[in-house]
Amino acid sequence: MAGFRLLVGLGNPGSEYENTRHNAGAQWIEALARQSQCSLRSEKKFFGQFGKVYIAGEECYLLIPTTYMNLSGKAVQAVCQFYKIPPEEVLVIHDELDIPPGTAKLKQGGGHGGHNGLKDIISKLANNREFGRLRIGIGHPGHASQVANYVLKKAAPDDYTKIEQAIDESLRYVDDIVRGNLNAVMNQLHSFKA
C-alpha cells in the first residue's frame, strides 16, 4: 500500500485542554515533532499547527488542527487540497474510548465510531473513509452519558503514564507507518500493552 504523507493529531486548542484524554492525537504529533526536530508553526491557511519533516526518506506533513475537535475536517481538507494528498495518504492519530490506556491500534479506513473529529474529517473528505487511523487508547468511563466529560478531563496519573507509553511505543514504528507497512506494524504494536 502507499504510505502516508499527512499525519494529523487531533485535539482541542487552548491550555485548558492540554494533556486531556481527547488530546492524545495532538500529543503524538508533538512528540514526533520533537523526535524529528521539526518546528510546528501556526499556519492560518491550514487552520492549525503545521510542519514539514522527512521520515524514512519521504517528505511528510505534520498537522494539529487548532479548530475545535468537531471541526477538524476543515484543517485536513485545506492541507489535502493544497498539497493534492488523497485520503488514503492521510493518517489521523486520535484518542480511542474502546481500547484501554497503554494500547494503540492502527488501521486503514473505517467509520467514525462516534468520534466527532473523525466524523467531520469524513464529511470534509467527501465521505471518503479510507484514511488511516492510529487509535491511542484512553479507556471508557463505563456509561455513554459520561463520555463527553471524561474525554475533556486529564487522565489519572497511572492512566496518563500508560497513554504516554503507548504514544512512545507507536512512535518506534513511524518509519514503517509512513512507508505504509501497516501489517508489519500491526503485528508488533497490537500486542503491546503498557
From Swiss-Prot:
Enzyme class: hydrolase
E.C. number: 3.1.1.29
Any one Gene Ontology BP term: rescue of stalled ribosome
Tree of life domain: Bacteria
Statement: the UniProt record of this protein carries the keyword Cytoplasm: yes
Transmembrane domains' residue ranges: none
Site positions (Discriminates between blocked and unblocked aminoacyl-tRNA): 12
Coiled-coil features, chain-numbered ranges: none
Catalytic activity: an N-acyl-L-alpha-aminoacyl-tRNA + H2O = an N-acyl-L-amino acid + a tRNA + H(+)
Reported function: Hydrolyzes ribosome-free peptidyl-tRNAs (with 1 or more amino acids incorporated), which drop off the ribosome during protein synthesis, or as a result of ribosome stalling. Catalyzes the release of premature peptidyl moieties from peptidyl-tRNA molecules trapped in stalled 50S ribosomal subunits, and thus maintains levels of free tRNAs and 50S ribosomes.
Family to which this protein belongs: Belongs to the PTH family.
Quaternary context: Monomer.
Name used for this protein in its record: Peptidyl-tRNA hydrolase
Taxonomic path: Bacteria, Pseudomonadati, Pseudomonadota, Gammaproteobacteria, Oceanospirillales
